[in-house]
């Protein structure tokens, strides 16, 4: 595939599997920041056809193992993720949704997250953003959600390697339930922990 750098473009998302390393090298050569995300979430309307493009667990294990061994930045980011997750308490927010961030669409619709566009909490044509932020019942409800509300996650052995995401849960749930866990991401956390522990054990033997 061919990329042309679009003027004023801030972000470009594109799917790759076999040649992602070539894309990374191309980006570095062209002084473009690039990140690798192997997590595909369902569409905001709960359509799951795109999930057929997800990597298998075997493919995930191969890529994560490769990055742990060869990518020092990935290891540093993983360490930061683990440290930050260890600091969290039961009363910690899940993420920035409706406590420090919110999104506005081109039609004026206001929604909690860029991936949650069907969950409209107001419209700036009808109300000010301030009023929506302060008065919206849905914003208030989302703001009350804490880690302790995800009962199963509290006792999970892989929680330090996982970041709970209400959007990916909601999009993948047929009923739009943000508390219905996406098991695919639970298994990603399991793979990350097992491979990281193996990496650390190998370092100690050297």
Regions found by a protein language model. Name each.
Residues 28-51, 102, 144, 183-205:
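Repeat-unit-sized solenoid/scaffold elements
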Residues 1-97, 103-107, 115-124:
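Radical SAM enzyme [4Fe-4S]-AdoMet core and its adjacent flexible, acidic
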Residues 117-206:
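Flexible mid-to-C-terminal extensions adjoining Fe-S/redox cofactors in radical SAM and related proteins
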């Amino acid at each position: 595939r061919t990329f042309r750098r679009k003027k004023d473009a801030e972000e470009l998302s594109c799917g790759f599997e076999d040649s992602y390393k070539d894309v990374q090298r191309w980006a570095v050569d062209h002084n473009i920041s690039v990140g690798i995300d192997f997590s595909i979430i369902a569409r905001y309307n709960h359509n799951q056809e795109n999930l057929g493009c997800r990597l298998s667990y075997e493919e995930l294990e191969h890529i994560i193992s490769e990055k742990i061994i060869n990518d020092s930045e990935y290891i540093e980011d993983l360490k930061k993720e683990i440290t930050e997750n260890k600091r969290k308490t039961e009363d910690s927010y899940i993420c920035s949704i409706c406590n420090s961030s919110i999104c506005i669409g081109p039609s004026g619709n206001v929604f909690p997250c860029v991936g949650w566009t069907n969950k409209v909490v107001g419209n700036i044509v009808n109300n000010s953003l301030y009023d929506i932020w302060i008065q919206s019942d849905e914003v208030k409800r989302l703001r009350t959600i804490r880690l302790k509300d995800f009962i199963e996650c509290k006792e999970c052995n892989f929680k330090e390697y996982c970041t709970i995401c209400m959007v990916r849960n909601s999009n993948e749930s047929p009923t739009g339930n943000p508390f219905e866990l996406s098991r695919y991401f639970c298994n990603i956390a399991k793979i990350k922990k097992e491979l990281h522990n193996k990496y650390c054990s190998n370092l100690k033997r050297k």
